[in-house]
Protein backbone atom coordinates (compact mmCIF):
# COMPACT_ATOMS: atom_id res chain seq x y z
CA UNK A 1 0.00 0.00 0.00
CA UNK A 2 1.40 3.39 -0.99
CA UNK A 3 2.13 6.01 1.66
CA UNK A 4 -0.34 8.74 2.57
CA UNK A 5 1.57 11.96 3.23
CA UNK A 6 0.63 14.64 5.75
CA UNK A 7 0.68 18.24 4.53
CA UNK A 8 0.54 21.52 6.43
CA UNK A 9 -0.50 23.95 3.68
CA UNK A 10 0.41 27.21 5.39
CA UNK A 11 -0.06 30.88 4.57
CA UNK A 12 3.65 31.72 4.57
CA UNK A 13 5.31 28.29 4.82
CA UNK A 14 4.27 24.72 4.11
CA UNK A 15 5.58 21.40 5.36
CA UNK A 16 5.19 17.72 4.44
CA UNK A 17 5.71 14.63 6.60
CA UNK A 18 5.24 10.87 6.45
CA UNK A 19 5.09 7.96 8.90
CA UNK A 20 8.21 5.81 9.01
CA UNK A 21 8.84 3.11 11.59
CA UNK A 22 5.84 4.26 13.60
CA UNK A 23 7.12 7.85 13.87
CA UNK A 24 6.28 10.98 11.84
CA UNK A 25 9.24 12.21 9.78
CA UNK A 26 9.44 15.69 8.21
CA UNK A 27 10.55 15.46 4.58
CA UNK A 28 13.39 17.75 3.51
CA UNK A 29 12.71 19.62 0.26
CA UNK A 30 14.95 19.78 -2.81
CA UNK A 31 16.68 22.89 -1.41
CA UNK A 32 17.59 21.03 1.80
CA UNK A 33 15.08 22.85 4.04
CA UNK A 34 12.37 21.28 6.21
CA UNK A 35 9.75 23.91 5.32
CA UNK A 36 8.87 25.43 1.96
CA UNK A 37 7.75 29.06 1.48
CA UNK A 38 4.17 29.19 0.15
CA UNK A 39 5.25 31.40 -2.74
CA UNK A 40 4.70 30.99 -6.49
CA UNK A 41 6.41 33.09 -9.17
CA UNK A 42 5.96 33.24 -12.94
CA UNK A 43 9.00 34.08 -15.08
CA UNK A 44 9.14 35.99 -18.38
CA UNK A 45 10.12 32.79 -20.20
CA UNK A 46 7.03 30.99 -18.89
CA UNK A 47 8.87 29.09 -16.17
CA UNK A 48 7.07 28.68 -12.85
CA UNK A 49 9.02 28.81 -9.58
CA UNK A 50 7.73 27.55 -6.23
CA UNK A 51 9.16 27.88 -2.74
CA UNK A 52 12.41 29.51 -1.70
CA UNK A 53 13.57 30.20 -5.28
CA UNK A 54 10.31 32.05 -5.94
CA UNK A 55 10.63 34.07 -2.75
CA UNK A 56 14.23 35.08 -3.54
CA UNK A 57 13.30 36.86 -6.77
CA UNK A 58 10.12 38.52 -5.46
CA UNK A 59 11.74 41.98 -5.26
CA UNK A 60 12.66 42.03 -8.94
CA UNK A 61 9.40 40.37 -10.03
CA UNK A 62 6.68 41.63 -7.65
CA UNK A 63 3.86 41.66 -10.24
CA UNK A 64 4.20 37.95 -10.96
CA UNK A 65 4.98 36.66 -7.48
CA UNK A 66 2.07 35.40 -5.37
CA UNK A 67 2.28 35.13 -1.58
CA UNK A 68 -0.23 34.32 1.18
CA UNK A 69 -2.76 32.88 -1.28
CA UNK A 70 -4.27 30.86 1.56
CA UNK A 71 -6.04 34.00 2.76
CA UNK A 72 -8.12 33.95 -0.43
CA UNK A 73 -9.14 30.28 -0.36
CA UNK A 74 -12.87 29.76 -0.79
CA UNK A 75 -13.40 33.17 -2.42
CA UNK A 76 -13.83 34.35 -6.00
CA UNK A 77 -10.43 36.10 -5.86
CA UNK A 78 -8.35 35.74 -9.05
CA UNK A 79 -4.68 36.38 -9.81
CA UNK A 80 -4.05 37.68 -13.34
CA UNK A 81 -0.68 36.69 -14.80
CA UNK A 82 0.01 37.61 -18.43
CA UNK A 83 -3.69 37.82 -19.22
CA UNK A 84 -4.59 34.49 -17.59
CA UNK A 85 -6.66 34.27 -14.40
CA UNK A 86 -5.61 31.84 -11.69
CA UNK A 87 -7.84 30.84 -8.77
CA UNK A 88 -6.47 30.40 -5.23
CA UNK A 89 -7.01 26.66 -5.68
CA UNK A 90 -4.74 26.63 -8.72
CA UNK A 91 -1.97 28.60 -7.01
CA UNK A 92 -2.24 26.39 -3.91
CA UNK A 93 -2.10 23.33 -6.16
CA UNK A 94 1.27 24.53 -7.46
CA UNK A 95 2.59 24.59 -3.89
CA UNK A 96 1.12 21.14 -3.23
CA UNK A 97 2.73 19.81 -6.40
CA UNK A 98 6.11 20.97 -5.12
CA UNK A 99 5.52 19.22 -1.77
CA UNK A 100 4.29 16.10 -3.55
CA UNK A 101 7.40 16.00 -5.77
CA UNK A 102 9.70 16.40 -2.75
CA UNK A 103 7.87 13.56 -0.97
CA UNK A 104 8.15 11.30 -4.03
CA UNK A 105 11.88 12.02 -4.31
CA UNK A 106 12.33 11.15 -0.63
CA UNK A 107 10.20 7.98 -0.68
CA UNK A 108 11.27 6.79 -4.11
CA UNK A 109 7.68 6.03 -5.08
CA UNK A 110 4.63 7.77 -6.48
CA UNK A 111 2.43 9.59 -3.98
CA UNK A 112 -1.29 9.94 -4.74
CA UNK A 113 -2.95 10.41 -1.33
CA UNK A 114 -2.67 13.02 1.41
CA UNK A 115 -4.11 14.34 4.64
CA UNK A 116 -4.14 18.16 4.53
CA UNK A 117 -4.61 20.47 7.49
CA UNK A 118 -6.71 23.65 7.63
CA UNK A 119 -7.34 26.28 10.32
CA UNK A 120 -10.02 25.12 12.76
CA UNK A 121 -12.20 28.08 11.75
CA UNK A 122 -11.99 27.51 7.99
CA UNK A 123 -15.53 27.41 6.59
CA UNK A 124 -16.90 24.81 4.20
CA UNK A 125 -15.98 26.80 1.08
CA UNK A 126 -12.39 27.17 2.30
CA UNK A 127 -12.16 23.48 3.17
CA UNK A 128 -13.63 22.47 -0.17
CA UNK A 129 -11.18 24.79 -1.95
CA UNK A 130 -8.34 23.03 -0.12
CA UNK A 131 -9.62 19.63 -1.29
CA UNK A 132 -9.93 21.00 -4.84
CA UNK A 133 -6.34 22.25 -4.71
CA UNK A 134 -5.25 18.76 -3.73
CA UNK A 135 -7.19 17.25 -6.58
CA UNK A 136 -5.63 19.72 -9.05
CA UNK A 137 -2.21 18.72 -7.69
CA UNK A 138 -2.96 15.06 -8.31
CA UNK A 139 -3.68 14.17 -4.71
CA UNK A 140 -6.67 12.30 -3.35
CA UNK A 141 -7.32 14.19 -0.10
CA UNK A 142 -8.33 11.41 2.28
CA UNK A 143 -9.07 13.72 5.18
CA UNK A 144 -9.11 17.42 6.06
CA UNK A 145 -8.19 17.95 9.73
CA UNK A 146 -7.84 21.04 11.88
CA UNK A 147 -4.36 22.41 12.50
CA UNK A 148 -4.53 22.62 16.32
CA UNK A 149 -5.87 19.06 16.42
CA UNK A 150 -3.01 17.87 14.21
CA UNK A 151 -0.51 19.61 16.48
CA UNK A 152 -1.98 17.81 19.49
CA UNK A 153 -1.47 14.48 17.71
CA UNK A 154 2.21 15.31 17.23
CA UNK A 155 2.49 16.36 20.88
CA UNK A 156 0.54 13.50 22.42
CA UNK A 157 1.59 10.42 20.46
CA UNK A 158 4.10 9.42 23.13
CA UNK A 159 1.87 10.51 26.03
CA UNK A 160 -1.17 8.32 25.42
CA UNK A 161 -0.93 6.45 28.73
CA UNK A 162 -1.71 9.48 30.89
CA UNK A 163 -4.62 11.89 30.73
CA UNK A 164 -3.86 15.47 29.71
CA UNK A 165 -5.97 18.52 29.01
CA UNK A 166 -4.02 20.73 26.62
CA UNK A 167 -4.54 24.15 25.11
CA UNK A 168 -3.16 24.56 21.59
CA UNK A 169 -2.38 28.18 20.64
CA UNK A 170 -1.80 28.23 16.88
CA UNK A 171 -0.66 31.57 15.43
CA UNK A 172 0.45 31.04 11.85
CA UNK A 173 1.26 33.36 8.99
CA UNK A 174 -2.32 34.21 8.16
CA UNK A 175 -4.64 32.48 10.63
CA UNK A 176 -5.11 32.02 14.36
CA UNK A 177 -6.78 29.11 16.14
CA UNK A 178 -7.04 27.91 19.70
CA UNK A 179 -8.29 24.46 20.65
CA UNK A 180 -8.70 22.72 23.98
CA UNK A 181 -8.32 18.94 23.90
CA UNK A 182 -8.48 15.96 26.23
CA UNK A 183 -5.71 13.43 25.63
CA UNK A 184 -5.73 9.98 27.17
CA UNK A 185 -5.80 6.26 26.33
CA UNK A 186 -5.15 6.98 22.68
CA UNK A 187 -8.16 9.32 22.39
CA UNK A 188 -7.64 12.91 21.22
CA UNK A 189 -10.93 14.64 21.95
CA UNK A 190 -11.52 18.31 21.11
CA UNK A 191 -13.42 20.04 23.92
CA UNK A 192 -13.81 23.42 22.21
CA UNK A 193 -12.31 25.53 19.45
CA UNK A 194 -12.24 29.18 18.47
CA UNK A 195 -10.25 31.35 16.10
CA UNK A 196 -9.85 34.09 13.53
CA UNK A 197 -9.03 33.11 9.95
CA UNK A 198 -7.83 36.66 9.24
CA UNK A 199 -5.21 37.07 11.95
CA UNK A 200 -1.59 35.96 11.68
CA UNK A 201 2.06 36.82 11.16
CA UNK A 202 1.25 38.77 8.00
CA UNK A 203 -0.64 41.27 10.16
CA UNK A 204 2.40 41.72 12.42
CA UNK A 205 4.55 42.30 9.33
CA UNK A 206 2.03 44.84 8.03
CA UNK A 207 2.35 46.91 11.22
CA UNK A 208 6.11 47.20 10.63
CA UNK A 209 5.57 48.01 6.93
CA UNK A 210 3.13 50.78 7.80
CA UNK A 211 5.43 52.15 10.50
CA UNK A 212 8.41 52.35 8.13
CA UNK A 213 6.30 53.72 5.26
CA UNK A 214 4.66 56.41 7.39
CA UNK A 215 8.02 57.49 8.81
CA UNK A 216 9.53 57.68 5.31
CA UNK A 217 6.49 59.57 4.00
CA UNK A 218 6.74 62.12 6.80
CA UNK A 219 10.39 62.78 5.95
CA UNK A 220 10.28 62.59 2.15
CA UNK A 221 6.65 63.02 1.10
CA UNK A 222 6.69 59.69 -0.79
CA UNK A 223 4.40 56.74 0.04
CA UNK A 224 6.49 53.64 -0.69
CA UNK A 225 3.36 51.46 -0.53
CA UNK A 226 2.35 52.79 -3.95
CA UNK A 227 5.53 51.40 -5.54
CA UNK A 228 5.26 47.61 -5.96
CA UNK A 229 8.99 46.96 -6.01
CA UNK A 230 9.61 49.20 -3.00
CA UNK A 231 6.68 47.57 -1.19
CA UNK A 232 8.13 44.12 -1.79
CA UNK A 233 11.44 45.27 -0.28
CA UNK A 234 9.52 46.64 2.70
CA UNK A 235 7.76 43.29 3.14
CA UNK A 236 11.03 41.39 3.19
CA UNK A 237 12.61 43.91 5.56
CA UNK A 238 9.59 43.76 7.89
CA UNK A 239 9.61 39.96 8.05
CA UNK A 240 13.38 39.96 8.66
CA UNK A 241 13.03 42.60 11.40
CA UNK A 242 10.23 40.64 13.09
CA UNK A 243 12.35 37.49 13.12
CA UNK A 244 15.45 39.29 14.42
CA UNK A 245 13.45 40.94 17.21
CA UNK A 246 12.60 37.48 18.54
CA UNK A 247 16.23 37.10 19.63
CA UNK A 248 17.42 40.74 19.83
CA UNK A 249 16.03 43.81 21.56
CA UNK A 250 16.56 45.96 18.47
CA UNK A 251 17.25 45.57 14.75
CA UNK A 252 18.60 47.77 11.97
CA UNK A 253 16.45 48.28 8.89
CA UNK A 254 18.72 49.33 6.04
CA UNK A 255 17.23 49.71 2.55
CA UNK A 256 19.50 51.74 0.25
CA UNK A 257 18.09 53.22 -2.95
CA UNK A 258 14.53 52.37 -1.95
CA UNK A 259 13.28 55.07 -4.35
CA UNK A 260 14.30 58.37 -5.95
CA UNK A 261 12.92 61.81 -6.75
CA UNK A 262 14.20 64.99 -8.41
CA UNK A 263 16.68 65.49 -5.57
CA UNK A 264 18.25 62.08 -6.03
CA UNK A 265 18.07 58.56 -4.56
CA UNK A 266 16.43 57.92 -1.18
CA UNK A 267 17.47 55.42 1.46
CA UNK A 268 16.00 53.90 4.62
CA UNK A 269 18.29 53.56 7.61
CA UNK A 270 16.43 53.20 10.89
CA UNK A 271 16.42 51.19 14.10
CA UNK A 272 13.35 49.31 15.32
CA UNK A 273 13.30 48.23 18.96
CA UNK A 274 11.41 45.28 20.36
CA UNK A 275 9.54 47.69 22.64
CA UNK A 276 8.30 49.68 19.64
CA UNK A 277 7.33 46.49 17.81
CA UNK A 278 5.36 45.34 20.86
CA UNK A 279 3.61 48.71 20.95
CA UNK A 280 2.69 48.45 17.25
CA UNK A 281 1.26 44.95 17.61
CA UNK A 282 -0.20 45.02 21.13
CA UNK A 283 -3.82 44.92 19.94
CA UNK A 284 -3.13 41.89 17.72
CA UNK A 285 -1.77 39.93 20.68
CA UNK A 286 -4.74 41.05 22.77
CA UNK A 287 -7.14 39.71 20.12
CA UNK A 288 -5.61 36.26 20.48
CA UNK A 289 -6.04 36.38 24.26
CA UNK A 290 -9.73 37.27 23.90
CA UNK A 291 -10.21 34.34 21.54
CA UNK A 292 -8.56 32.06 24.13
CA UNK A 293 -11.03 33.32 26.73
CA UNK A 294 -13.93 32.47 24.41
CA UNK A 295 -12.58 28.95 23.81
CA UNK A 296 -12.30 28.34 27.55
CA UNK A 297 -15.77 29.73 28.17
CA UNK A 298 -17.50 27.74 25.43
CA UNK A 299 -15.77 24.55 26.60
CA UNK A 300 -16.62 25.19 30.28
CA UNK A 301 -12.93 24.84 31.06
CA UNK A 302 -11.01 26.83 33.66
CA UNK A 303 -7.32 27.68 33.43
CA UNK A 304 -6.72 25.40 36.42
CA UNK A 305 -7.92 22.46 34.31
CA UNK A 306 -5.23 23.01 31.66
CA UNK A 307 -2.21 20.73 32.09
CA UNK A 308 -0.12 21.91 29.14
CA UNK A 309 -0.03 24.84 26.73
CA UNK A 310 1.36 24.17 23.26
CA UNK A 311 2.49 26.92 20.90
CA UNK A 312 2.10 26.21 17.19
CA UNK A 313 3.03 28.34 14.19
CA UNK A 314 6.11 30.43 13.46
CA UNK A 315 4.53 33.61 14.85
CA UNK A 316 4.53 32.10 18.35
CA UNK A 317 8.28 32.78 18.42
CA UNK A 318 7.45 36.46 19.03
CA UNK A 319 8.46 37.12 22.68
CA UNK A 320 5.39 39.30 23.36
CA UNK A 321 3.13 36.45 22.23
CA UNK A 322 4.89 33.93 24.47
CA UNK A 323 4.77 36.35 27.40
CA UNK A 324 1.07 37.10 26.89
CA UNK A 325 0.17 33.41 26.74
CA UNK A 326 2.27 32.68 29.83
CA UNK A 327 0.75 35.58 31.79
CA UNK A 328 -2.80 34.63 30.83
CA UNK A 329 -2.56 30.88 31.41
CA UNK A 330 -0.10 31.01 34.29
CA UNK A 331 1.84 28.20 32.63
CA UNK A 332 5.12 28.05 30.77
CA UNK A 333 4.30 26.99 27.18
CA UNK A 334 5.64 23.56 26.26
CA UNK A 335 8.73 23.51 24.05
CA UNK A 336 8.27 19.83 23.23
CA UNK A 337 7.11 20.38 19.66
CA UNK A 338 8.57 22.33 16.74
CA UNK A 339 6.01 25.07 15.95
CA UNK A 340 6.84 24.98 12.23
CA UNK A 341 6.68 21.21 11.82
CA UNK A 342 4.23 19.74 14.35
CA UNK A 343 1.10 20.33 12.23
CA UNK A 344 2.52 18.39 9.27
CA UNK A 345 3.67 15.67 11.67
CA UNK A 346 0.16 15.44 13.11
CA UNK A 347 -1.27 15.18 9.59
CA UNK A 348 1.16 12.31 8.92
CA UNK A 349 -0.01 10.57 12.11
CA UNK A 350 -3.64 10.89 10.97
CA UNK A 351 -2.56 9.47 7.61
CA UNK A 352 -1.00 6.57 9.53
CA UNK A 353 -4.29 6.00 11.34
CA UNK A 354 -6.08 5.78 7.98
CA UNK A 355 -3.56 3.27 6.58
CA UNK A 356 -3.42 1.23 9.77
CA UNK A 357 0.23 2.06 10.47
CA UNK A 358 -0.81 3.87 13.66
CA UNK A 359 -3.06 1.88 15.97
CA UNK A 360 -5.08 2.68 19.09
CA UNK A 361 -5.40 6.36 18.21
CA UNK A 362 -8.84 7.96 17.94
CA UNK A 363 -9.27 11.59 16.88
CA UNK A 364 -12.56 13.24 17.91
CA UNK A 365 -13.22 16.75 16.62
CA UNK A 366 -16.18 19.07 17.23
CA UNK A 367 -18.84 20.98 15.33
CA UNK A 368 -18.29 24.76 15.75
CA UNK A 369 -21.92 25.95 15.94
CA UNK A 370 -25.28 24.67 17.21
CA UNK A 371 -27.50 22.82 14.71
CA UNK A 372 -31.29 22.70 15.02
CA UNK A 373 -34.65 23.27 13.34
CA UNK A 374 -37.29 26.00 13.38
CA UNK A 375 -40.33 25.23 15.55
CA UNK A 376 -43.63 26.95 16.35
CA UNK A 377 -43.31 30.72 16.64
CA UNK A 378 -39.98 30.86 14.82
CA UNK A 379 -37.99 29.44 17.72
CA UNK A 380 -34.71 27.65 16.92
CA UNK A 381 -34.88 24.29 18.70
CA UNK A 382 -31.33 22.88 19.07
CA UNK A 383 -30.58 19.23 18.36
CA UNK A 384 -26.77 19.28 18.34
CA UNK A 385 -25.09 21.93 20.50
CA UNK A 386 -21.87 23.71 19.45
CA UNK A 387 -18.64 21.95 20.45
CA UNK A 388 -20.40 18.56 20.28
CA UNK A 389 -17.93 15.81 19.44
CA UNK A 390 -18.27 14.42 15.92
CA UNK A 391 -19.27 11.99 14.53
CA UNK A 392 -22.61 12.45 16.29
CA UNK A 393 -26.29 11.56 15.96
CA UNK A 394 -29.16 13.23 17.80
CA UNK A 395 -32.91 12.88 17.30
CA UNK A 396 -36.08 14.36 18.78
CA UNK A 397 -39.83 13.84 18.34
CA UNK A 398 -41.89 16.72 16.94
CA UNK A 399 -45.54 16.97 15.87
CA UNK A 400 -47.87 18.86 13.54
CA UNK A 401 -49.34 22.31 14.12
CA UNK A 402 -52.64 21.91 12.24
CA UNK A 403 -55.42 19.33 11.95
CA UNK A 404 -55.16 16.83 9.07
CA UNK A 405 -51.72 18.10 8.10
CA UNK A 406 -50.24 15.70 5.53
CA UNK A 407 -46.82 17.26 5.02
CA UNK A 408 -44.29 19.28 7.00
CA UNK A 409 -41.37 21.51 6.02
CA UNK A 410 -38.15 21.03 7.98
CA UNK A 411 -36.11 24.25 8.23
CA UNK A 412 -32.52 23.43 9.30
CA UNK A 413 -30.58 26.27 10.97
CA UNK A 414 -27.13 26.82 12.49
CA UNK A 415 -26.15 29.37 15.13
CA UNK A 416 -26.38 30.40 18.76
CA UNK A 417 -29.45 32.69 18.64
CA UNK A 418 -32.77 31.50 20.09
CA UNK A 419 -34.81 32.67 17.09
CA UNK A 420 -34.46 30.77 13.80
CA UNK A 421 -34.54 33.98 11.73
CA UNK A 422 -31.41 35.23 13.52
CA UNK A 423 -29.41 32.12 12.61
CA UNK A 424 -27.94 30.77 9.36
CA UNK A 425 -30.25 28.68 7.15
CA UNK A 426 -28.53 25.48 6.04
CA UNK A 427 -31.42 24.00 4.10
CA UNK A 428 -35.11 23.10 3.89
CA UNK A 429 -36.86 19.89 2.92
CA UNK A 430 -40.39 18.46 3.02
CA UNK A 431 -41.77 15.26 4.55
CA UNK A 432 -45.00 14.25 2.76
CA UNK A 433 -47.45 11.39 3.18
CA UNK A 434 -48.31 11.96 6.84
CA UNK A 435 -51.58 10.22 7.77
CA UNK A 436 -54.31 12.86 8.39
CA UNK A 437 -54.88 13.34 12.13
CA UNK A 438 -55.67 16.05 14.67
CA UNK A 439 -52.73 18.36 15.27
CA UNK A 440 -50.32 17.11 17.87
CA UNK A 441 -51.14 13.44 17.24
CA UNK A 442 -48.54 12.51 14.54
CA UNK A 443 -45.06 11.69 15.81
CA UNK A 444 -42.29 12.95 13.52
CA UNK A 445 -38.74 12.00 14.41
CA UNK A 446 -36.14 14.51 13.21
CA UNK A 447 -32.56 13.19 13.29
CA UNK A 448 -29.21 14.92 12.69
CA UNK A 449 -26.15 12.89 11.64
CA UNK A 450 -22.65 14.42 11.34
CA UNK A 451 -19.80 12.23 10.10
CA UNK A 452 -16.07 12.59 10.82
CA UNK A 453 -15.65 14.89 7.81
CA UNK A 454 -18.27 17.31 9.15
CA UNK A 455 -20.91 16.45 6.53
CA UNK A 456 -24.43 16.82 7.93
CA UNK A 457 -27.46 14.71 7.06
CA UNK A 458 -30.90 15.59 8.42
CA UNK A 459 -33.83 13.17 8.19
CA UNK A 460 -37.50 13.28 9.18
CA UNK A 461 -39.59 10.13 9.68
CA UNK A 462 -43.33 9.76 10.35
CA UNK A 463 -43.39 7.12 13.09
CA UNK A 464 -46.87 5.93 12.08
CA UNK A 465 -46.39 5.44 8.34
CA UNK A 466 -42.62 5.03 8.15
CA UNK A 467 -42.43 7.75 5.48
CA UNK A 468 -39.00 9.41 5.41
CA UNK A 469 -37.35 12.46 3.82
CA UNK A 470 -33.80 13.72 4.20
CA UNK A 471 -31.24 16.29 3.08
CA UNK A 472 -27.43 16.14 3.05
CA UNK A 473 -25.73 19.45 3.87
CA UNK A 474 -22.09 19.46 2.81
CA UNK A 475 -21.71 23.09 3.90
CA UNK A 476 -22.20 22.39 7.60
CA UNK A 477 -19.59 25.02 8.47
CA UNK A 478 -20.34 27.28 5.52
CA UNK A 479 -19.69 30.42 7.53
CA UNK A 480 -16.76 32.78 7.50
CA UNK A 481 -14.80 33.29 10.71
CA UNK A 482 -16.39 36.74 10.97
CA UNK A 483 -19.90 35.24 10.75
CA UNK A 484 -19.09 32.67 13.45
CA UNK A 485 -17.61 35.30 15.76
CA UNK A 486 -20.58 37.56 15.06
CA UNK A 487 -23.05 34.75 15.81
CA UNK A 488 -21.48 34.01 19.19
CA UNK A 489 -21.03 37.68 20.15
CA UNK A 490 -24.59 38.53 19.12
CA UNK A 491 -25.86 35.58 21.13
CA UNK A 492 -24.19 37.05 24.23
CA UNK A 493 -25.17 40.64 23.48
CA UNK A 494 -28.80 39.80 22.82
CA UNK A 495 -29.12 36.86 25.24
CA UNK A 496 -31.55 38.72 27.47
CA UNK A 497 -33.53 40.04 24.52
CA UNK A 498 -33.69 36.57 22.99
CA UNK A 499 -34.86 35.13 26.29
CA UNK A 500 -37.73 37.61 26.51
CA UNK A 501 -38.75 37.03 22.91
CA UNK A 502 -38.70 33.28 23.40
CA UNK A 503 -40.74 33.55 26.60
CA UNK A 504 -43.30 35.74 24.82
CA UNK A 505 -43.64 33.22 22.00
CA UNK A 506 -44.05 30.36 24.48
CA UNK A 507 -46.82 32.26 26.28
CA UNK A 508 -48.58 32.99 22.96
CA UNK A 509 -48.21 29.35 21.90
CA UNK A 510 -49.72 28.24 25.21
CA UNK A 511 -52.57 30.70 24.76
CA UNK A 512 -53.34 29.35 21.31
CA UNK A 513 -53.16 25.79 22.60
CA UNK A 514 -55.43 26.61 25.53
CA UNK A 515 -58.05 28.13 23.22
CA UNK A 516 -57.85 25.17 20.82
CA UNK A 517 -58.16 22.56 23.58
CA UNK A 518 -60.95 24.39 25.39
CA UNK A 519 -63.04 24.89 22.24
CA UNK A 520 -62.53 21.26 21.23
CA UNK A 521 -63.46 19.89 24.67
CA UNK A 522 -66.41 22.26 25.00
CA UNK A 523 -67.71 21.03 21.65
CA UNK A 524 -67.26 17.37 22.68
CA UNK A 525 -69.12 17.92 25.96
CA UNK A 526 -72.13 19.34 24.12
CA UNK A 527 -75.29 19.49 26.27
CA UNK A 528 -73.41 18.38 29.39
CA UNK A 529 -72.48 22.05 29.85
CA UNK A 530 -75.27 24.53 30.53
CA UNK A 531 -75.85 27.45 28.17
CA UNK A 532 -74.89 29.89 30.93
CA UNK A 533 -71.61 28.06 31.66
CA UNK A 534 -70.86 27.71 27.97
CA UNK A 535 -71.47 31.42 27.42
CA UNK A 536 -69.10 32.33 30.28
CA UNK A 537 -66.32 30.10 28.93
CA UNK A 538 -66.80 31.39 25.37
CA UNK A 539 -66.49 34.95 26.67
CA UNK A 540 -63.20 34.02 28.35
CA UNK A 541 -62.04 32.36 25.11
CA UNK A 542 -62.77 35.56 23.18
CA UNK A 543 -60.79 37.54 25.74
CA UNK A 544 -57.75 35.29 25.22
CA UNK A 545 -58.13 35.55 21.43
CA UNK A 546 -58.28 39.32 21.70
CA UNK A 547 -54.99 39.67 23.60
CA UNK A 548 -52.96 36.64 22.46
CA UNK A 549 -51.45 38.36 19.40
CA UNK A 550 -50.54 41.52 21.30
CA UNK A 551 -47.31 42.44 23.08
CA UNK A 552 -48.72 42.58 26.62
CA UNK A 553 -47.54 39.22 27.96
CA UNK A 554 -49.02 39.80 31.41
CA UNK A 555 -52.44 40.46 29.85
CA UNK A 556 -52.22 37.18 27.94
CA UNK A 557 -51.26 35.30 31.11
CA UNK A 558 -54.18 36.92 33.00
CA UNK A 559 -56.68 36.03 30.25
CA UNK A 560 -55.41 32.43 30.17
CA UNK A 561 -55.70 32.17 33.95
CA UNK A 562 -59.29 33.48 33.85
CA UNK A 563 -60.19 30.98 31.12
CA UNK A 564 -58.57 28.11 33.00
CA UNK A 565 -60.39 28.99 36.24
CA UNK A 566 -63.73 29.22 34.43
CA UNK A 567 -63.16 25.82 32.86
CA UNK A 568 -62.08 24.33 36.20
CA UNK A 569 -65.48 25.18 37.69
CA UNK A 570 -67.25 23.33 34.89
CA UNK A 571 -64.90 20.35 34.97
CA UNK A 572 -65.21 20.01 38.74
CA UNK A 573 -68.98 20.01 38.47
CA UNK A 574 -68.87 17.35 35.75
CA UNK A 575 -66.57 15.14 37.82
CA UNK A 576 -68.91 15.38 40.78
CA UNK A 577 -71.87 14.47 38.59
CA UNK A 578 -69.96 11.42 37.29
CA UNK A 579 -68.83 10.30 40.74
CA UNK A 580 -65.29 11.69 40.50
CA UNK A 581 -63.32 12.89 43.51
CA UNK A 582 -63.97 16.48 44.49
CA UNK A 583 -61.33 18.95 43.44
CA UNK A 584 -59.92 16.77 40.67
CA UNK A 585 -60.76 19.12 37.85
CA UNK A 586 -58.83 18.86 34.59
CA UNK A 587 -56.63 21.35 32.84
CA UNK A 588 -57.52 22.08 29.21
CA UNK A 589 -53.80 22.60 28.57
CA UNK A 590 -52.84 19.18 29.85
CA UNK A 591 -55.06 16.50 28.35
CA UNK A 592 -53.76 13.27 26.85
CA UNK A 593 -55.42 10.26 25.26
CA UNK A 594 -58.37 10.94 23.03
CA UNK A 595 -58.27 14.64 23.79
CA UNK A 596 -54.61 15.12 22.89
CA UNK A 597 -54.04 18.05 20.59
CA UNK A 598 -51.74 20.90 19.72
CA UNK A 599 -48.14 19.96 19.72
CA UNK A 600 -48.27 17.07 22.20
CA UNK A 601 -48.92 13.36 21.88
CA UNK A 602 -49.33 12.62 25.60
CA UNK A 603 -48.02 13.77 28.94
CA UNK A 604 -45.39 11.07 29.18
CA UNK A 605 -43.46 12.07 26.07
CA UNK A 606 -41.12 14.88 27.01
CA UNK A 607 -39.49 14.78 23.58
CA UNK A 608 -42.57 16.08 21.77
CA UNK A 609 -42.46 19.83 21.14
CA UNK A 610 -44.44 22.27 19.04
CA UNK A 611 -43.18 22.50 15.48
CA UNK A 612 -43.84 25.22 12.93
CA UNK A 613 -44.74 23.32 9.78
CA UNK A 614 -46.48 24.49 6.66
CA UNK A 615 -49.61 22.73 5.48
CA UNK A 616 -49.21 21.50 1.91
CA UNK A 617 -52.00 19.90 -0.09
CA UNK A 618 -51.22 16.50 -1.57
CA UNK A 619 -51.34 16.54 -5.34
Curated annotation (Swiss-Prot):
Biased composition regions of type Low complexity, renumbered to the chain: 589-606
Keyword flag Chaperone: yes
Coiled-coil region(s): none
Alphabetized Pfam families for the sequence: HSP70
Keywords (A to Z) from UniProt: ATP-binding, Chaperone, Nucleotide-binding, Phosphoprotein, Stress response
SUPFAM superfamilies, A to Z: Actin-like ATPase domain (SSF53067), Heat shock protein 70kD (HSP70), C-terminal subdomain (SSF100934), Heat shock protein 70kD (HSP70), peptide-binding domain (SSF100920)
Molecular function terms, GO-annotated: ATP binding; ATP-dependent protein folding chaperone; unfolded protein binding
Phosphothreonine modifications at: 175
CDD domains associated with the record: ASKHA_NBD_HSP70_DnaK-like (cd10234)
Induction remarks: By stress conditions e.g. heat shock.
Alphabetical list of InterPro entries matching this protein: ATPase_NBD, Chaperone_DnaK, Heat_shock_70_CS, HSP70_C_sf, HSP70_peptide-bd_sf, Hsp_70_fam
Superkingdom of source: Bacteria
Region (Disordered): 578-619
Acidic residues: compositionally biased ranges: 607-619
Family: Belongs to the heat shock protein 70 family.
Role this protein plays: Acts as a chaperone.
Name of the protein in question: Chaperone protein DnaK
Amino acid sequence: MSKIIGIDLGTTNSCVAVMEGGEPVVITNSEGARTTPSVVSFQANGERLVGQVAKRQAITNPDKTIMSIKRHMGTDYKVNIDGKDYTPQEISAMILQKLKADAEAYLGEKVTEAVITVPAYFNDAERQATKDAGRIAGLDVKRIINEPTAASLAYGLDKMDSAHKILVYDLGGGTFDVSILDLGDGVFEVVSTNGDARLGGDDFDQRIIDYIAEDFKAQNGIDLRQDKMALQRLKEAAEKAKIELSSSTQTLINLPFITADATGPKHIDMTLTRAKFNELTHDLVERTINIMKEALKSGNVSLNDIDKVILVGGSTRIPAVQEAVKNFTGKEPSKGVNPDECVAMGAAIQAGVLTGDVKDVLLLDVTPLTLGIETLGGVATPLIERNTTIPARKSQIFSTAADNQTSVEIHVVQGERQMAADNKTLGRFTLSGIAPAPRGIPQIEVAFDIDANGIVKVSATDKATGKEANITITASTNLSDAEIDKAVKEAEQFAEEDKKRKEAIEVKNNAEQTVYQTEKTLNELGDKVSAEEKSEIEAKIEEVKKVKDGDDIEAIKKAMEDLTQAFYKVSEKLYQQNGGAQGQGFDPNNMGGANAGAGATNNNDDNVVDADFEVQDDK
